[in-house]
Amino acid sequence: MNRRSFLAASSSGVAAMSASAATAAAQPSGKTFLVAHGAWSAGWAWKKMHPLMAAAGHRLVTPTYTGLGEREHLASPSIDLETHIQDMLGVIKFEQLENFILIGHSYGGMVATGVADRVPERISRVIYLDAFVPKDGQAMVDLLGVDAAARVRQGVKNGDGWRVAPSAIPPDTSAEDAEWIHGLRLPQPLKTLETPVRLRHGDTKIPRSYVYYTRIGPGDPFHAFAARAKAEHWDYHELDASHSAHVTAPQPLMTLLHSIASA
């Protein structure tokens, strides 16, 4: 190779490297998402999201609360909301999670709110997915409303006396997914729904997003939280999905989560 050819090749190589670096710089860096799952559920319910997260360059961490899923053997009447908050804090500590996005789905909004209050310095954003958003001193039964809370407690009395049976799954769930979910969901300790969240630092200063699923089921309790999020000027989104979008609409949910993380 003569000198002119060498210089031309070198220039082309530098240009290609510069273009590659520019492309890489333009792409958002991967994020870590930690999921606080809903009632009766567990980490297994998010299995459709793992490959989608990986393909988008993100990491998804989906632990299971004490007494549910693969931790069923630890179930007891003493399990409460604080137990589940401590579960999540343990994962954050031992997985050494920093600058991560915390997701709370449904009941998981109760857990996520408590977690965000304890370790705000580790969390870059909280995303509530069709979730309860309590204020200090509120329990989930308070947010359900008097009639719904009474039905929950009556159902517990009619059952084993300490657990709440799973609710109906969304009607647009496929037969295959319905069989999968029915086979794995477990009753939830009532005390987790009766324990008020205690916020040591008041309303969080962490950026928050609320995603409201618009395929509304009967007795929808989440419209009030969506309205609050809009009134308080949160980052607000709506998704054409029923209550378990991670099961019934994983790709649209992934697209939205990636967009929120990249903003």
Predicted feature residues:
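Conserved hydrolase catalytic core segment
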Residues: 101-136
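N-terminal export signals
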Residues: 5-25
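Conserved HGGG/HGGXW glycine-rich cap/lid loop of the alpha/beta-hydrolase fold
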Residues: 31-70
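Active-site nucleophile elbow and catalytic-triad environment of alpha/beta-hydrolase enzymes
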Residues: 183-200
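Active-site loop/oxyanion-hole signature of alpha/beta-hydrolase fold enzymes
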Residues: 65-100, 117-118, 143-145
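Catalytic active-site module of serine/aspartate enzymes centered on a nucleophile-bearing elbow/loop
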Residues: 237, 241-263
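Conserved loop-alpha-helix segment in the C-terminal half of the alpha/beta-hydrolase fold
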Residues: 215-240
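Flexible "cap/lid" loop of the alpha/beta hydrolase fold
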Residues: 128-159, 221
